[in-house]
């Protein structure tokens, strides 16, 4: 996360080469693709150092999120739009969030779930494709 923050800072300053160096180091050290252009909110953390996480460079992730290992946040073919993840959301290990969708605030995405549709605030989704199994949750009950 520190390398991402450093690369994002260089990116926001308009320094062209240093964000790419940070991106390359993230790939080498963590086997992940987390780009400096990606907007990731404060206090968001990666479980197990973000091993094998792939996040599209145009994705937006809110504050206070937890992203498990092997998570993919990206587009779908023939679409240039990518997911937006609300604040306080937990993305379980191996989950895939794909396409022009919005994951609401304080949601829980189960391990290995494939999310292809919007998820309302305070919901739990699981499965392939992901389905809502609980609504109006208190996220502190889940992590």
Regions from the PLM with identified roles:
Residues 19-49:
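Long amphipathic N-terminal alpha/beta scaffold segment
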Residues 1-31, 130-131, 137-143:
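Terminal amphipathic alpha-helical/low-complexity segments used for targeting or macromolecular assembly
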